[in-house]
Amino acid sequence: MIAKAKAISHGINDLRYITGESQHKKHPEKIYRVLDNLLPSEPDAMGIWNSMQLTISQHRPIKNSVIRIELSPSPKHTQFYDIEDWQKLWQDFAEEFDKQVITGKDGKIRSCPTNLANSKYSVWLHTESKGEVPHLHAAVCRLDENGNINNDHNIHLRAQRAAERVAKKRGWTTAEQIRNRNIPQVNRDCMEVLKAMPSWSWDEYKNTLIRKGYTVHEREDKKGL
């Protein structure tokens, strides 16, 4: 199971997307409300946004006022899921998300436990993606109902670890296990490409890997290399 999380400033656009109200969503009929927390009864995107903004206005302004979360379990684990099963999956994930204390290499606390449990959020099931792989989208208010901020330091790690813990508890294949299983094949493919090249060329190397089905992410160093 894979999870992503990020604090964003364009919360209303994200809400329109996850609720299926965005014009970019071609099949809103394949998007389902899973659950809302501390919100009015079944609000639309603007209703969710206004409710979150009300909470923020009562405490302090914050730029990135919404946490965007995506949760993607393997389809084989959720093929017989109903809405209540998806609700339980989200609640288990949120519990693991909240309880973590993230420390730096020096042992100092970088991020205290979050409080999604007492924060406004809305969770939706999307089944309209390529291959119709079901996955969850959530939008969470950065401030809980007591005015405390949900820290976003290393929030992507918080999400990944929460997903790993839930997957392990359920006996599911984890992202780490998939990565470890794929490493030998990736190494073999890379070496085969290198051995077949008459001379070194980054572009040729990259394009050959892409033709093999890999996605190559390029990063420049401080020298632009």
PLM regions with names:
Residues 1-225:
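N-terminal nicking endonuclease/strand-transfer module with a His-rich metal-binding environment
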